């Protein structure tokens, strides 16, 4: 009886040892050895371990699994293209735009400085000067090459033509007023004296017969006034003015501006335009100063539409992007390049308790098998 119990215990211990060691060795052989072991040209069986040996296949299968079951287009759609995500993105963008642009005290010049355009006011003024100079040169060229008739519209020409009789009437009225004035009388007297003195002895003889020139002033004055009041005078002057005006309209406008100094005019014009623009002052204001309703417009119109279109476009391109990313190959490369030592450490660290239980289970099963074998041997 004692021999039976000793034999039974001995076989149970041997079975437990074999079962435990076998399971422990099997677990180790999942990862070890990391490389194949050779004796001369003969490779030792079961080297390298299962996972190192099948790492390429494992990498390919993991890549396929990830692409076909884990990171599928539908997974991305559910995760990143849901209505909730879109609303969160929209809210985030609205907040950032409001904080960064519309409620920020930064001026337009500050934004230009950030973008690297710190000399923008001077650059704009130079551009303005160049534009004004170009337009000024264009105007001068137009005045030099085109006639007044071409430059003036038909309506303006008709208006100016109609002003000629009015101008003639005004000139005659002013001439009449002048010759009836004391100053006009003095002018007439001086003209008569100059005329008589220019005729020499003949003039002196006339002066002797007529007496002093003062006696002629009244007569000449009346005749001049009659001449100015006569309808024929107005008609004659109107005709002369009209003829001369028609001749002038066929000449370039620049013919009448030959003596004008254009450089000072250009400089003053450029200065005036720059003063009116006040570029530096205008750029020294925040965006909200010129666009107070911009925040609400961006929030209610631009951002929602932009986000919606961006999500629709991104969802349309999702499958194409995933194909271009080639996630299967990425996973395969990463798994294939991942050190086996790190993988072993990771798996054992996570499943250490389970592996111990497997080892214990092997020992228990080995012990039970040893007991059964002991019983069989005893009965035989």
Swiss-Prot record:
GO cellular component terms, semicolon-separated: plasma membrane
Family, per entry: Belongs to the UPF0754 family.
The protein's name is UPF0754 membrane protein Bsph_0374
Question: How does this chain sit within the bilayer?
Answer: Multi-pass membrane protein
The portions of this protein that span the membrane are 1-21, 357-377
What PANTHER family has UniProt attached to this entry?
UPF0754 MEMBRANE PROTEIN YHEB
Q: Which UniProt keywords apply?
A: Cell membrane, Membrane, Transmembrane, Transmembrane helix
Q: Which organism is it from?
A: Lysinibacillus sphaericus (strain C3-41)
Q: Which InterPro entries match?
A: DUF445 (IPR007383), UCP032178 (IPR016991)
Pfam families for this protein: DUF445 (PF04286)
UniProt key word Iron-sulfur: no
Q: What is the lineage of its organism?
A: Bacteria, Bacillati, Bacillota, Bacilli, Bacillales
Where is this protein found?
Cell membrane
């Amino acid at each position: 009886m004692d021999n039976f119990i000793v034999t039974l215990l001995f076989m149970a211990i041997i079975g437990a040892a074999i079962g435990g060691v076998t399971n422990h060795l099997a677990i180790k052989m999942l990862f070890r050895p990391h490389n194949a072991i050779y004796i001369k040209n003969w490779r030792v069986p079961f080297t390298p371990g299962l996972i190192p040996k099948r790492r390429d296949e494992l990498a390919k299968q993991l890549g396929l699994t990830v692409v076909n079951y884990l990171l599928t287009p539908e997974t991305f759609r559910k995760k990143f293209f849901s209505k909730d995500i879109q609303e969160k993105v929209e809210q985030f963008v609205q907040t950032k735009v409001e904080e960064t642009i519309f409620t920020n005290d930064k001026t337009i010049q500050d934004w230009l400085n950030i973008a690297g355009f710190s000399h923008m006011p001077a650059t704009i003024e130079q551009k303005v000067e160049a534009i004004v100079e170009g337009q000024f040169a264009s105007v001068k060229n137009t005045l030099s090459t085109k006639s007044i008739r071409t430059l003036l519209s038909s309506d303006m020409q008709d208006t100016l033509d109609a002003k000629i009789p009015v101008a003639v009437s005004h000139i005659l009225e002013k001439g009449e007023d002048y010759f009836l004035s004391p100053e006009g009388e003095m002018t007439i007297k001086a003209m008569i004296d100059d005329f008589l003195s220019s005729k020499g002895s003949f003039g002196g003889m006339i002066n002797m017969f007529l007496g002093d020139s003062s006696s002629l002033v009244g007569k000449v004055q009346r005749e001049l006034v009659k001449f100015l009041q006569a309808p024929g005078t107005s008609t004659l002057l109107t005709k002369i003015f009209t003829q001369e005006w028609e001749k002038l309209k066929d000449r370039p406008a620049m013919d009448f501006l030959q003596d004008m100094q254009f450089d000072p005019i250009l400089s003053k014009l450029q200065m005036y335009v720059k003063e009116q623009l006040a570029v530096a002052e205008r750029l020294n204001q925040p965006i909200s100063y010129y666009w107070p309703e911009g925040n609400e417009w961006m929030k209610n119109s631009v951002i929602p539409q932009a986000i919606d279109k961006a999500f629709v476009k991104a969802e349309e391109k999702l499958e194409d992007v995933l194909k271009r990313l080639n996630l299967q190959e990425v996973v395969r490369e990463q798994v294939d390049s991942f050190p086996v030592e790190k993988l072993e450490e990771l798996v054992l660290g996570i499943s250490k308790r389970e592996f111990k239980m497997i080892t214990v289970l092997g020992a228990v099963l080995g012990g039970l098998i040893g007991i059964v074998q002991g019983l069989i041997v005893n009965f035989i």
